[in-house]
A protein has these predicted regions:
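Alpha-helical elements of Rossmann-like donor-binding domains used by nucleotide-donor carbohydrate transfer enzymes
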Residues: 24-27, 99
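A short linear boundary/processing microfeature
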Residues: 27, 91-95
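Glycine-centered tight turns that cap/initiate beta-strands
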Residues: 34-37
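Short amphipathic alpha-helices within nucleic acid-binding modules
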Residues: 19-23, 73, 79-91
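Glycine-rich beta-strand-turn "strand-cap" elements at beta-sheet edges
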Residues: 1-3, 39-68, 94-117
């Protein structure tokens, strides 16, 4: 939605912790949806790559066959404005930062800004 405020997080999950992470994100996402101004929340697990295929030719991505170092997950969180985003982010850190840290190989990355489309 144009004029909303969005965030993308990258989580690099320890391979042996993926089931625990996926269980936790069900709880996190439910709470995120309840935050004031939340328009959307999605989580994606990276299963595919374009390595060895050509997307310019219409080739589909190939499925990943092994885990190297970590399993990557992305979240996309959209809120109606940056003030509600700030409050929601505080809620997220207060409730899940420590629990998530135990499952990751490094702190998660956050990229945020005004939505342009």
């Amino acid at each position: 939605m144009k004029d909303s405020f969005s965030e993308v997080k990258l989580f690099q999950v320890k391979p042996e912790k993926t089931a625990e992470f996926e269980s936790l994100i069900l709880s996190i996402a439910a709470g995120q949806k309840e935050q004031q101004g939340c328009l959307d929340i999605k989580y994606v697990k990276r299963f595919f790559t374009f390595y060895d295929s050509d997307p310019h030719l219409g080739d589909p991505p190939r499925e990943l066959t092994k885990i190297v170092k970590c399993v990557k997950y992305f979240s996309y969180w959209e809120l109606n404005n940056k003030e509600n985003y700030g409050k929601a982010t505080k809620w997220f850190f207060d409730n899940y930062e420590k629990e998530l840290a135990k499952l990751l190989i490094a702190p998660f990355d956050i990229h945020c800004g005004n939505s342009v489309y």
